[in-house]
From Swiss-Prot:
Belongs to the transcriptional regulatory Rex family. It comes from Staphylococcus aureus (strain NCTC 8325 / PS 47). GO terms for biological process: negative regulation of DNA-templated transcription; response to redox state. SUPFAM superfamilies: NAD(P)-binding Rossmann-fold domains, Winged helix' DNA-binding domain. Pfam families: CoA_binding, Put_DNA-bind_N. The lineage of its organism: Bacteria, Bacillati, Bacillota, Bacilli, Bacillales. The gene is rex. Modulates transcription in response to changes in cellular NADH/NAD(+) redox state. Its main location: cytoplasm. GO terms for cellular component: cytoplasm. This is Redox-sensing transcriptional repressor Rex. NAD(+) binds at G91, V92, G93, N94, L95, G96.
């Protein structure tokens, strides 16, 4: 990624969408795609797609579109998916167990390798391919395994305390499923997942944009 151009956050958040769609085209044997096809599939206007791609140099040619293999190579490099990304989950309640069972089954380059909880009846359980560890081992394990991405699914009342421990362990990215906002240093990225807001957004788009 260019060091001279600051990429908008909205563009960066769309990269995984583009990557997943282009990967699906590759699996179907398609070797090129244009911005209109991407637009129709992802419901993102073509101008936005072209602008997003323009931040990263010449990814396509006018009249030809984008080469699938070239796009995949580019997205993998930008998303740091050339190597396996190890992820930890903290809080193994119903949602945590569901995420462990799913464990990014459609993403070959990401996997949850560690899980932590405080409940004695959960610690030691094997869920999917992961054995749940005592939360007392959190900081030590994250440092040892060099894990810098964590999914947070704890109760809201302890979310900030756990977040502070994650920062202490060197974590740089937190996907926060707890209802409360957490405070972290500026170099730690937090993405808040509020299912209520996501559903409201979905209903809005269904009402206003469905044909």
């Amino acid at each position: 990624m260019s060091d001279q151009v600051k990429i908008p956050r909205a563009t960066l958040k769309r990269l995984p969408l583009y990557y997943r769609f282009v990967s699906s085209l590759k699996s179907k044997g398609i070797d090129r795609v244009n911005s209109k096809a991407i637009s129709d599939a992802l419901q993102i206007d073509s101008a936005t797609i072209r602008r997003d791609f323009s931040y990263f140099g010449e990814l396509g040619k006018k009249g030809y579109g984008y080469n699938i293999d070239s796009l995949l190579d580019f997205f993998k490099s930008e998303l740091s998916e050339s190597d396996m990304i190890k992820i930890a989950i903290v809080g193994v309640g119903n949602l945590g167990k569901a995420l462990l069972t799913y464990n990014f089954s459609i993403h070959d380059d990401m996997t949850i390798t560690e899980a932590f909880d405080v409940k004695e009846d959960v610690i030691g359980q094997k869920i999917g391919n992961v054995i749940v560890k005592d939360n007392d081992e959190l900081i030590t394990t994250l440092k040892k395994e060099e894990i810098d991405v964590v999914i947070l699914t704890t109760p809201e009342r302890v979310a900030q305390k756990v977040a502070d421990e994650l920062v202490q362990a060197g974590v740089k990215g937190i996907l926060n499923f707890t209802p409360g906002r957490i405070n972290t240093p500026s170099d730690v990225q937090v993405h808040q997942i509020d299912l209520g807001i996501e559903l409201q957004s979905l209903l809005f788009f269904m009402k206003n944009y469905s044909e």
